[in-house]
């Protein structure tokens, strides 16, 4: 396989694809607060991105023939950076590594301040003895008076007096809520099959229309390729209407992006010979739905590759793509369902890592490097969808969107695990090179035995630990198998398997573990430089699929609003009847929090600053900074 490599891109916070994009303001729903005093320091820019790998140019926006495939334009990927490397030259402050796992935020006597400057003492490597702490944006533990230095406008502006209706409920500006828990519980159930006489067609169509979220993929000729609910024959009439609307705009030399019908939003993207459509009655923005459609398109490319897809339709525009995609429907469905349930990784365009000590992660990295074979391109250790370790060539990198596709295949669809202890899978990683296949060796570990035996198929997703070894050579199965065995032996010796097991059992910390007595129920924190995120454990407020969806709807609204066009805000606060939500965005990080609707603003501000300082203290445990290279 031919692939072109380039230096790994490193993201500057100002280049985050959402930071300048968005839509209209949410004046009716939200109150925004900007701190002018801190803006000068926070808006300093990092160096611009180096060029993206030239292979990404295959991901084109419009239809192209196979002859012009090398001239196609770049697809809008979910993120602009990789997780494998990051801004490793950012200054660090050294802190000693204790013996225990203390989740609580530390105390600092300095006044509250926020810094975005890179002009800090630099060290190219963190301490081998202890976990280092970034000082790029120092938010020490402070008292209320010092919090006001950053959140002065936020604390000064009080919400308008609440109004009471006949039911006695307080009428704050509120996000639209997802209605009924019982109704949402049936969202992922199949609608059934049409009988031979077609007598149940009306019933099936009613079930289809009751779904809150639909994804459709059809060809430029209007032929249904895949739909999340039902089948192309059952909903052919609706597909025809959508195709007619798209064609009307194309004939007018216009591009249909989205439209609304009542409370239903339709979003359309065209990629080559395919139209991808999202139909949603959930609270999601156009940008969020387009990002989900991009991921589905990348899932198709991971099966077919872009040259194959383009060639099929250039030879025969009415090609039925169902047969080439046979076996991939489950991957598309599980990916789509993760978006419907609510995916922090998709929302933030970032990956989550398993929290372990820096020295422990380094031991796993060293074991990967020590056992590396010549045919290895990438090596990953993944625990329940959370990245533990990655090894890569110095001038190659993995795109977060590619890793999300791999994690969906391995941990969500369950097709790989059902195949047994070892799997050998050809896969295209569109963010790396959309024109050819890589070959992936996957093996699961059984954490219940503290050994390298293959995992039992009954292990849950959170209990599943996968070793993923990727090569460009399709004959390298046995070489990678030998590497896996040697790597597991090394992890047995240095007790890395035990460490991973304990980290999984420990789980994510709760908000009260980090900030005792906090008013926060949950938070999401994204490190923009590392393109990774961390979050607290889900509490009782998110105990069901429906409640988790409502939480993610709140985050969707908050994220959409704070990243809206011309929304140059630092702090954003919204109060509804059910929640109080809070966003704090700087060039270095994004913090999103949810609390009860009557949460005190001062308490919100103090808790937010303590969450940020805790993340910075634990940075090299929470995130993979640099990774292992060879």
Swiss-Prot record:
<dbReference type="InterPro" id="IPR043972">
    <property type="entry name" value="FUZ/MON1/HPS1_longin_1"/>
</dbReference>
<keyword id="KW-0967">Endosome</keyword>
<dbReference type="GO" id="GO:0006914">
    <property type="term" value="P:autophagy"/>
</dbReference>
<dbReference type="GO" id="GO:0006623">
    <property type="term" value="P:protein targeting to vacuole"/>
</dbReference>
<feature type="compositionally biased region" description="Polar residues">
    <location>
        <begin position="1"/>
        <end position="13"/>
    </location>
</feature>
<keyword id="KW-0653">Protein transport</keyword>
<dbReference type="InterPro" id="IPR004353">
    <property type="entry name" value="Mon1"/>
</dbReference>
<keyword id="KW-0926">Vacuole</keyword>
<dbReference type="GO" id="GO:0035658">
    <property type="term" value="C:Mon1-Ccz1 complex"/>
</dbReference>
<feature type="region of interest" description="Disordered">
    <location>
        <begin position="1"/>
        <end position="63"/>
    </location>
</feature>
<dbReference type="GO" id="GO:0032585">
    <property type="term" value="C:multivesicular body membrane"/>
</dbReference>
<protein>
    <recommendedName>
        <fullName>Vacuolar fusion protein mon1</fullName>
    </recommendedName>
</protein>
<dbReference type="Pfam" id="PF19038">
    <property type="entry name" value="Fuz_longin_3"/>
</dbReference>
<dbReference type="Pfam" id="PF19037">
    <property type="entry name" value="Fuz_longin_2"/>
</dbReference>
<feature type="region of interest" description="Disordered">
    <location>
        <begin position="93"/>
        <end position="140"/>
    </location>
</feature>
<dbReference type="Pfam" id="PF19036">
    <property type="entry name" value="Fuz_longin_1"/>
</dbReference>
<dbReference type="GO" id="GO:0000329">
    <property type="term" value="C:fungal-type vacuole membrane"/>
</dbReference>
<feature type="compositionally biased region" description="Polar residues">
    <location>
        <begin position="117"/>
        <end position="140"/>
    </location>
</feature>
<comment type="similarity">
    <text>Belongs to the MON1 family.</text>
</comment>
<keyword id="KW-0813">Transport</keyword>
<dbReference type="InterPro" id="IPR043970">
    <property type="entry name" value="FUZ/MON1/HPS1_longin_3"/>
</dbReference>
<keyword id="KW-0472">Membrane</keyword>
<dbReference type="GO" id="GO:0016192">
    <property type="term" value="P:vesicle-mediated transport"/>
</dbReference>
<dbReference type="InterPro" id="IPR043971">
    <property type="entry name" value="FUZ/MON1/HPS1_longin_2"/>
</dbReference>
<comment type="function">
    <text>In complex with CCZ1, is required for multiple vacuole delivery pathways including the cytoplasm to vacuole transport (Cvt), autophagy, pexophagy and endocytosis. The MON1-CCZ1 complex acts at the fusion of vesicles with the vacuole, through its regulation of the SNARE complex during the coordinated priming and docking stages of fusion, and particularly at the stage of tethering/docking.</text>
</comment>
<feature type="compositionally biased region" description="Basic and acidic residues">
    <location>
        <begin position="101"/>
        <end position="113"/>
    </location>
</feature>
<keyword id="KW-0072">Autophagy</keyword>
